[in-house]
Every structure is written in C-alpha cells, then in structure tokens.
Amino acid sequence: MKNTMKKPVSIPVEKLRPFEGHPFKVKDDEEMNNLIESVQTQGILSPLIVRPIESTEEYEVISGHRRLHAAVKAGIREVPALVVSLDRDAAAIVLVDSNLHREHILPSEKAFAYKMKAEALAHQGFRADLTSDQLGPKLTVEMISESDSASQVKRYIRLTNLIPEILQYVDEGRISFTPAVELSYLNEQEQYDLLEQMELNDCTPSLSQACRFKKISQEEGLTPEVIATVMSEEKANQREMFKVPMERIRQYVPNANAKQAEDFVLKACEHYRKFLIRQRNRDER
C-alpha cells in the first residue's frame, strides 16, 4: 500500500465520503455510543485510511467509517487520516481486511465483504471461481479469508442472492445460516412468495423445508401454493411457542440478535428458578 503522505493529516469531515458499496453497517447502537464517548474524551486514536477522489478535493474512506460517524456525532470538525494512493480494487481489499477482525459481524456483512474481495481479486488477475467446487490456486482462497474454508466462503457469498427482507431474517438469527444458503437458490419471485408465507404464518422454514424448496425450484419451479403447503407443515420446534417482543428485551441485551436474546432469557429463567428454590428452602427451615 503506497502512501501519498507518510504522516496522517487533518481532513475536514465534510470532505470525506463513504466507500461506495461498502458492506459494513454503521449503526447508532451501544457500541457506537461508547465510541462517541471515547472520541469526545480521547480523540481519534487511530487515523482513518482514505484515498483521493479524482478531480476533486474530497477523499473516499477506506477504513474508519465508524470512527468518522462517531466524530461527526461528537461535533468534531476535522479527523486525522492517512492518505494512500490505491485503485478501487486494492482499496476494496484493504476495506474488507480492516473490518473482518471486528468482534460482531452480521452474516450479510461477511457475505457482501467476501463477494467484494473476491471480485476485487478477480479484477487483479487472480482466479476466484466461487461458483464451482474447484476454486483454483489455494492462495486465492486464502487471500479471501484466513478464518473460513473455501466452501464456507462460497456459502457466505451465496447469501448475497437473498432478497433484503429474508437476509434481514438471517441477520436477526430468525433463519439459521444453512437453511439460508439453501434458500439462496430460489429466484427472486419465489423468495418473495416465501416471504409472504413467513410473514402470514409468523414462521420460518426449517433446513428440511429449505432443501425441499431448493429441489422443487430447480426441478419444476416453486409456486405460492406449494410454498404454502410445505410451510403449513408443523415443525417439531414450532409445536409450542412462547414469544416475547424483542423491544422488551433490548434494554437488557441491546446488541444481541434473536438467538443471543433467547439464550439470555433462558439463562435468566434458570437463575431465577434457582433463586426460588433457595428462597423456598430458607422458608422451610
């Protein structure tokens, strides 16, 4: 990565633009509030990485979108940034690599990040055939991800074929990763027909149902009637349900997805059960 300037410079926030199409969400949540507080008290400790936008006096942010957002929220007018000379593909690779180490990454973020990096590598001349089982040189796969296998990378990229509404279900933990991969083989209209049934019946397809949908879609096409019939089948894990709106749990676990919130509630119930047992034992003495 060739630096246009060796040391960070101060750049007005109004001259900074987000990287076009970057896959990582910048959310106003508890983590952002903590970052804003840190920026207010300590400033931005790690400079942003930016690149000049041709024929303008503006810059495109490669790394540091969350820090920039926190700075704007904190009322800071200028931020330190390292200006580098990179083409879009090289910048995309740096952007992805600088974000994949984060503790909390949504499935959709990882999916589009892997896709962005694979496309950038392909533009640079590396083989990144993610549609077949033969990925080409092992080095290419390792360059896409150091933590996920080639097959897992392909499965994540499959998620980019999901319509936004179903992908949101995946991010919220309401549809598991493996069924979501199977659903990604449905065409757009089939996915919207499925979404309608999911919302109508307040349920999501199991892995078995998702596999059946994929098979029917590839063999003869999936109709709304078939989707309704399959979704009306009772799943073992849906025979008896107790639901609590996420809004009522957010104050206790603000950053949790649906699965993490469920685990929190179950652990809380177990602690309370033990408390009641201890209380009863004391009363019986």
Model-derived features with residue positions:
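Short, charged/polar connector segments at secondary-structure boundaries
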Residues: M1-V84, A90-H104
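Charged, alpha-helix-enriched surfaces in structured cytosolic catalytic cores
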Residues: K27-E30, N34, H65-R66, A91, ...
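Glutamine-centric residue-chemistry signal
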Residues: Q40-S46, Q124, Q134, Q191, ...
